[in-house]
Amino acid sequence: MQYVGRAFDSVTKTWNAINPSTLSGAIDVIVVEQEDKTLACSPFHVRFGKFSLLLPSDKKVEFSVNGQLTGFNMKLGDGGEAFFVFATENAVPRELQTSPIVSPTTSPKQTPSINVTEPQDLELDKVSQDHEKDQSNTYLMEDGYEFPLTRDLIRRSKSDADQTPPTGFKHLRHSSCLEMAGSDRTPSMPATTLADLRLLQKAKELGKRLSGKELPTRVGDNGDVMLDMTGYKSSAANINIAELARETFKDEFPMIEKLLREDEEGNLWFHASEDAKKFAEVYGHSPPASPSRTPASPKSDSALMDEDSDLSRRHSLSEQSLSPVSESYPQYAKTLRLTSDQLRSLNLKPGKNELSFGVNGGKAICTANLFFWKHNDPVVISDIDGTITKSDALGHMFTLIGKDWTHAGVAKLYTDITNNGYKIMYLTSRSVGQADSTRHYLRNIEQNGYSLPDGPVILSPDRTMAALHREVILRKPEVFKMACLRDLCNIFALPVPRTPFYAGFGNRITDAISYNHVRVPPTRIFTINSAGEVHIELLQRSGHRSSYVYMNELVDHFFPPIEVSTRDEVSSFTDVNFWRSPLLELSDEEEDDTNKSTSKSPKTPKNTKFGYQEFEGIDEEDAQDYSPSPLIKSFNELMFEGEEDEEGEEDVENAV
């Protein structure tokens, strides 16, 4: 039952990883300090599931390093992928275009404020200092609203308009006011009279009566108060409400009818008093506000209406065409990398750093690791499925039920490799949605007290189904691995003959092809099969076989220790090169003599009928060296003569 429970939980987690709606994860990042002390990084691949982001407004991703928030926020795309946003003046391709992240620093620039503006309907703040000069033209009510006293506008002369051309205008119409902002006109209002105050008091009482509880009302989205007109039936309640509204407006209708007048152009004119209305009908404009103001030349109503209609026609023009200076707005583009200065501001520590990406105030978080290396750190690549596990498919299945299905000795071998000064990197074709489960699996491997060393886990940024389709159906996992390794070579920025990858472990020929693509020597490409037999790719035809356990005994031979202190030293100061005796200096004559001595024909041996070897090509001078000495020659003759005499005596005796 324990295995069944583990299998059910693991299948649920696996389904969540496969389901695009719940897929979330982040790939580890590698930051390299290059030879010129600049920093370069691999892409920041982060993806959030749709169920983790219930609100479409959750677009801002907070990015933190080692628990400290950074100022480089990310933005979420439609598919849940996160990316950085930067502004540029250059042209941006359509697939890389985006909008800026919502923040005070990236908000669009506001247009310059105009001197004369229309007060907002629900503005409850105090009047700003910019409008203090217009206080004589308005009356501040008890509830904080500004009520204009008159709506007649006195125009300046054409000479003044020619001297100060307008920079823009906005023709605003309201139910209770008409203001022309940004134009070459300045409002001039009459002095406040007792009749005006009585009129304002009546308006206040009317507002209070309209806002009573006996009238069913509601406030719209734009702040307007509307009567409840639901039902569209002539019921008794509706009749009573209509009668109440009629009684409410009965006393005010004559006054409103006198104050409002509709002209030929459809404009509404609102006068402060009857005196102002009569003055406008006689002279064509309102009386002057004070003696200090210079009155404009009187104009007829027809001239004023013609000018207003002309402004209405010009209102259709865009504000951009009327602006004196055209501003160039920056373009915003997507990116997955940070610059060298931005990486340096993260205050990274050598080795492992923790990353976290949070959305919606930390309710949805993805974690990853960042490894800070140097350009001269040798890197060992290791596959996961089939290389650390015993097989591709069974490695996934037995991991789901909690059974160990790893090769024996792999933890100790990788630990010894890292102890000798090498960096380990885990490369797999799994999708980014399996990042957390893959890191959890590697972290929990333990064999005889040894665990796998820490290293970046590089996965495919594709979705789970796309990654499985490429690896299982198309059988081309090397497409992703080759592209990934090429990108990592670029961030190390080493010369072409050199490569940052020292060795590679895999289980297929596709892994060997990927490692060979980034110039890993064939003598250091190790392939392991499901039986645990390791062979070198170059010696595969020779039948050479080994295992992780036997490689532990020769780990210093395959991966010699690298001293950190002497890693950057020149090779001429090693023990072999520094302590050996220097080469002899030969003159030209000595070199000619040595060439003559070596030009003689070699002395090749020749077998005789007695089995001895004689040398051909021997000169007469050299033949004396191989002839026996006189002493040896006389000794041999005496020995042979004695033997002949004994043989003769024996023959004679036999004959007798």
UniProtKB/Swiss-Prot annotation:
It comes from Schizosaccharomyces pombe (strain 972 / ATCC 24843). Residues 99-121, 282-328, 587-656 are annotated as: Disordered. Residues 640-656 have a biased composition (Acidic residues). The gene is ned1. The keyword Glycosyltransferase does not apply. Residues 291-300, 596-609 have a biased composition (Low complexity). The modification Phosphothreonine is found at T106. GO terms for molecular function: magnesium ion binding; phosphatidate phosphatase activity. It comes from the Eukaryota. Interacts with dis3, pim1 and nup189. InterPro entries: HAD-like_sf, HAD_sf, LIPIN, Lipin_N, LNS2, LNS2/PITP. It holds the Pfam family LNS2. Residues 99-118, 318-328 have a biased composition (Polar residues). Keywords: Phosphoprotein. This is Nuclear elongation and deformation protein 1. May have a role in the maintenance of the nuclear envelope structure and in minichromosome stability. Belongs to the lipin family.
